[in-house]
Amino acid sequence: MAAIRKYQYRFLARIVVEAAAPLNIGSGNKGIKSDSLIVRDVNGLPFIPGTTLAGLLRHSLSQEEQETLMGSQASGSSLVITEAKILDAGGTPVDGLAQPENLNSNLLSRYVELPIRQHVRIGHRGAAVRHGKFDEEIVLKGTRFCFEIEFVADDKGQESKIKKLLSNLLSNTFRIGSGSRSGFGQIDVVSCKYRMLDLANDKERELYLAKSSSLSQEWEGFVDDILEELKTLKPTSEAWVEYQLRLTPDDFFFFGSGYGNDAADMTYVRESYVAWNGNVATIKEKDEVLLVPASSVKGALSHRLAFHYNRLVGNTIESLQERGLTPEDVTGKNNPAVKALFGSEGEKSARGGEMIGKQRGNVLLSDVMELRATQPKLLNHVSIDRFTGGAIDGALFTEQVAYGGQQELPVITLFVRSDALQDEDIRQAWESALEDICKGMLPLGGGVNRGHGVFKGSLTKNGQLLYGE
């Protein structure tokens, strides 16, 4: 008769993460105000489901590690992962039914009405693509969440496995939620309290049994914060190439919010975020914040990438006509470089609604948000009737743009999977598109045909200067 295995060891970790960029933890539901609503708990506050965390952590492991830690068809998982609950202004997780005075606090009350980010997909003709307009609800940058992981083992020597799993959270390319290729999902690990228990020891067994399942209650058993140790185990980013853009605006730039206000018909996007001083949170109001949406940078790069790739491989109007092709066949998702780096939503199959040929993007970048008071400027516009010389009825509008003041933007970091750049034409086209931004030849944002969004700067690749000073 086979001996009974005793799983007497428990490895417990309590992790606090902070949203380094806005998060989009989708519920799969639509609402009156947004096409995509975030998931909320019983208190109406954002949270991260345990299944989301389990899937992300599983994806970060090798196949062998997945079967060891998270089970397979032949064995169950050795990991127990809780939901990640939001922290209040005092740094305490809100788990269970919250008191009304806590929900009405200056911090948690901000999560009743969250920002809605507007998106529109632009075609190669410079106009919106049909069905390409959508919006989504997002969680504020700086929001902190707390969750716990328990690893059950029969051998004390398996401690290295759980620590390696925890170190994956520190990877530069680890993202949570949807929109990871559009600027959302980047996190920072704030703390990682840890404890190993041997249940064969009476005192440690009693300590384990006394632990509450509520995240809002501190457990005296956590004695060590192993964050610094995990940093030494942090996985390398050899599979990714890191590019950095350091840009300074020439003058005005405009990343549209999709809304107007009392002063203008068109305004640039601004969002509040949460700032922490120790375990005390405060709200930085949107009027004080500079925001550069990563999706705006990504869209501009996608179009310029297609241009440079077609230039390098000789896709001209004449050559396309000779081959019986149209510009649509070498632009957008049909362009090999665009598909390799930014992915594709696929095509509908001949049988019906199923999408085939879907591919995830291989470029990671995050929204840039910094506490910096931008100078809004109102610009008035009017369209003139060429025959009468007077204003066209309904063609007078005002836009509110941001003035950069010749101050350098926060660094924009882009991670690209190295295997996506193996094709030399794709690599050259990609780096040429990035250089165009630094030269001021590829404006970013809206109103570029009116002179907005011109930036100058430098480009580095894995720390090595490619362009600029």
Where would I find each of the regions flagged by the language model?
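Small/polar/charged residue-enriched interaction surfaces, especially the RNA/DNA-contacting tracks
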Residues: 1-469
